[in-house]
Amino acid sequence: MVYIKQIELSHFKSFGGTTSLPLLPEFTVVTGPNGSGKSNILDALLFALGLSSSKGMRADRLPDLVNSTYASRSRSTVETLVTVTFALDDWQPEAEETEEGEGTGLQPGMAEWTVSRKLRVTPSGTYTSTYAMNGEACTLQQLHEQLSRLRIYPEGYNVVLQGDVTNIISMSPRDRRQIIDELAGVAQFDRKIEQAKGKLEAVKEREDRCRIVEQELIEQRDRLAKDREKAQKYQALRQEQATKQSWEAVLRWRAGQRQVQALQRSLAQLATDAATDQQTQQTLEQQIQQTEATLDRLNQRVKALGEEELLKLQAALAQQEAEQRQSQRQQQELVESQTQTQQQIQALLQTQAQLQTEGQQQAEQARTLQTTIAQTLQPQYQQALEQVEAARQSAHALAAQSQDWVTRQTSLRQQADAIAAQVEPQRAEQAQLQERQTQLQQQLEATQSALVTVTAELETETEQAEGDRAALSQAEAAVVTAADQLVRLEEELQIQQETRDRLLKEQRDKQRQLDRQESLRQAMQETQGTAAARLILDTGLPGVHGLVAQLGRVEPRYQLALEVAAGGRLGYLVVDDDGVASAGIELLKQKKAGRITFLPLNRIRAGKQPEIPRWQQPEGLVDLAIALVDCDDRYREVFKFVLGGTVVFERLDQARRYMGQYRIVTLDGELLETSGAMTGGSIARRSGGLSFGSPDSGESAEVRAIRDRLEQLEVILDRSELQILNLQAAIKDAASTLSDRRQQQREQQLTVQQRQQTLQRLQQQQQQLNAELQQRQQQASQAQARLAALALELPAALKQLKTLRQALAELEDSPIHGEWQQRQTLLQQQEALLQQQETALRQAEQQLQQLQTDQKRLQERAIAARTQVSQLRQQQGEQLNRLAQLDEQQRQQATAIAQLQQRQAQLEAQLGQEKVDRDRTERQLQEQRSQRQNLVWQQEKRQQQQQELQQQLTDLEVQLQAEQQELPQPLPDIPEMVQQQGIEALQHELRSLAKRIQAMEPVNMLALEEYERTQARLEELSEKLTTIEAERTELLLRIENFTTLRRRAFMESFEAIDRNFQEIFAHLSDGDGSLQLDNPEDPFSSGLNLIAHPKGKPVRRLASMSGGEKSLTALSFIFALQRYRPSPFYALDEVDSFLDGANVERLARVIRQQAQAAQFIVVSHRRPMIEAAERTIGVTQARGAHTQVLGIPQP
């Protein structure tokens, strides 16, 4: 808990010397006689902490705070020093504070923190005041910054003086509301709003500058647009001229090309003919050669009887037959494979049947065996068991007859059996221990191996668990971050929605205001006649010039005088003639739109104007009214009619001398008629009235402000709606992200839990293996020790057993022993038979179990056989498909073989015609040789013609090559119509274009580039203006959001303080009270009223209460403020002075209750307050000199 631990005063006011006042964190009352210096302790707090000026410490100047006795005795510099020590028990800085690292400031872990202030006063009356923290100098601002960390504020109510209660009572409601403004931090929002408005003004200035530049660029662009249009036309004509000139050159060149092509075609035709003849000749030569070869071949074929072709056909036929055989082999293989598959299926089916049969047989065997066991083996075993029991009883009877022999034999046998019984278990135990030791060694090795494995797994899982826990921490941090983001977005959305709702309400209110103003304006227009004029002007009636007020202009200093002189005639409508006026009157009648006076220019006649010679001008005369109007000459008669012969004087006293001589108006608006009537007094310039230069009843500044605000609200609301939509989308995304992060967190938690379970399981396994290892080691040690003991005990026991058995053998040689031996032999035989029967029974049971196992194995084999049968049948289906393909292939091969065989038969039939063909070929050879001779004669004639055409082609190509170098590259595309019209029409168009181009010159060709540059600058500026507009809208929305936050902060503070006030007032007065705003809808233009309802009295406002009630209400308000923003200490100076005893008791109880959370120092001399205090400090003056303090024991 933070509290004031000590106050040290040196020469402060009534305190002489140095006085230390220790304090405790409790309810302390400072009491004493009037004038003893009680309140000076609180003044010392205000002085040291810089919470008040000298006026607040009841001093005119700071030097008055120095002890007067001390100051009067000393002729040198005097000083006063006050030091306040704070105890910082358990104090920690707020989470949002940043540590500055300064030694003088508050630091975590400090036990105490001191603040001091020294005032030095020189003999001349000048003074210096210095503050210090922990003995180091600081500024007042630095001190207040550190005090604010302790929740001690200059504007707070840590120290409440008598005047503070009175101020609460006497201050205006608006000032009282400003107290809550300070606590709510409204000033901070006001600073933000002002900063935003400053930025908005800067943005507006930038926008205005850009608008000016934009207007200049638009004007420049419009000027350049005309030059650009002419330059574009000129450029198009020049381009068209160049294009058509290129067309002309191309057409000339193409005409030459066509001539070249014609010659080339002729040459080509000759060459083609020559080539054709040559080809024909070559063909004839080839035909001749072929015919000769054919003739030779026919001769040979006739001799050879066509053997070669027949061989080829036979080879092809053999190939087809080989392929057919190959297909048949494949088909055969598939058939065989299919057969094998079918055989495998049959074998498997047989196997299935065999397995089924074997299963049935084994089942039958099992049933038979079960019957044998139940009906034969089990009864035989019971019978043998009964016989063994009978033999044993007979042996016992024989033993009773030969008691001595039996006794001795029994004794020896018992001894031998006892030793054997002792030895045999030991030998068996030794064997078991040896086997056990071997098993334990193996188990130890296995356990150690398993322990190593589990330990390695445990280390791996531990590392993974650490990683999982780190991932879980990250997932939890991500969830917190996503949740904070969602909360921030929702808070911002709520602010935006509140701002939107508030602006919508303001928009509706402004619209209603505008509607009321419009209604008033319309009503005023109707009374002035301008409504009818507006109707005439809006209909576009020809011949209407406008209202008289629109057609003239005057200087502002004469405007009032001339408007008074003109009066209602400013609302007359000027038209061309009386016909237009008649049509306007008819229109008003039809529309029932009221009446108006028309002034036809062809009919209007003004009266005679007074003439005042310049040398006779009266004192104070300004001029004739008509001379002060600036208008078009055609409206001069109109204004003479409107103003009449009115003259303008400066003042009324000057005009009165000429009253009755002229119609006079003064600059202040007094009107003096020639009839003697005088009009004057106070004049109100009504909004909406007609004035010179206004088109109609202009809008008032209030209406324009409302319209501007409505436009601004429309822009801000659009931006706000966009922000709300964006925030809603962002909230949706943030909620989705938060859900995903939470799901990841849950998954990670599940992973960590599973990993923890795995770790626990491995740890348990490790513990079990360790315990098992220890147990095995202990068992091995025990077995080893027991084996060592047996190695010592067994040899002696075996020797004794041998001796006993020899003695027993000698005894058994007697006759009694023979009979005993027979009985024993019979018993052994029957026991052996019993053992055989038992063995047979056990074997039968094992065989039955084996049969059951075999039945299970047969079932598994049957299932496998069924699966294999299914696979083989699938393979069989694939083989059938392949057989069908091979059948189709064999049919095609058979068809090909049949065709080859048919051809072979035809060739064999044709061999008989070979001789006839040979004779026909000889005649053909003679005709071909004759054609070859005619072609030789035609070739010689064509060669001569070709040489003449080649010379013409060479000359024309040289000419075209020179023209081709001047052609544009690539060649332009010439329209089909131009090609059809010909080169003469094109040359005519070129001459016409040349004349048009010459007529347009000169042309500003730079306008093309300048226009584009200007347009680019204008587009860039438009983008910049769009950005500035968005920035301005954003600033407007920010201002509105700050306004929303300011109102929210105020209302939250107001509502909290109101709740505190109601609770505290109920304790102080046994009544109820509340805080009330004059206008809750607009709290910042409202005042704050304290409404109280003391018990048994009607509800009253603060002004109508008694003095005590006012004090209680004001104190309740102060305590409500303190509770809203708590501080570590409070000091009250005689706040109970206006209260009666009962109210002082209630006040003391409230303070004692409040003191549980903060330190209270109360200056009072009222008994109920002193009795309620936990500690009392007395203040007195020693012999009227200095104030002294002392502790008073509590009763």
Swiss-Prot record:
The organism's place on the tree of life at top rank: Bacteria
Gene3D superfamilies: 1.20.1060.20, 3.30.70.1620, P-loop containing nucleotide triphosphate hydrolases (3.40.50.300)
Gene Ontology MF terms in the entry: ATP binding; ATP hydrolysis activity; DNA binding
Localization: Cytoplasm
Keywords: ATP-binding, Coiled coil, Cytoplasm, DNA-binding, Nucleotide-binding
InterPro entries: P-loop_NTPase, RecF/RecN/SMC_N, SMC, SMC_hinge, SMC_hinge_sf, SMC_prok
CDD domains from the UniProt entry: ABC_SMC_barmotin
Main localization of the protein described in the UniProt heading: cytoplasm
GO BP annotations, alphabetical order: chromosome condensation; chromosome segregation; DNA replication; sister chromatid cohesion
Residue ranges occupied by any SMC hinge domain in the UniProt entry: 542-658
Coiled-coil residue windows: 185-241, 273-348, 380-528, 698-1043
GO CC annotations, alphabetized: chromosome; cytoplasm
Residues binding ATP, per UniProt: P33, N34, G35, S36, G37, K38, S39, N40
Subunit structure: Homodimer.
Domain notes: Contains large globular domains required for ATP hydrolysis at each terminus and a third globular domain forming a flexible SMC hinge near the middle of the molecule. These domains are separated by coiled-coil structures.
HAMAP family, per the entry: Smc_prok
Family: Belongs to the SMC family.
Listed name of the protein: Chromosome partition protein Smc
Naturally occurring in which organism (per UniProt): Synechococcus sp. (strain ATCC 27144 / PCC 6301 / SAUG 1402/1) (Anacystis nidulans)
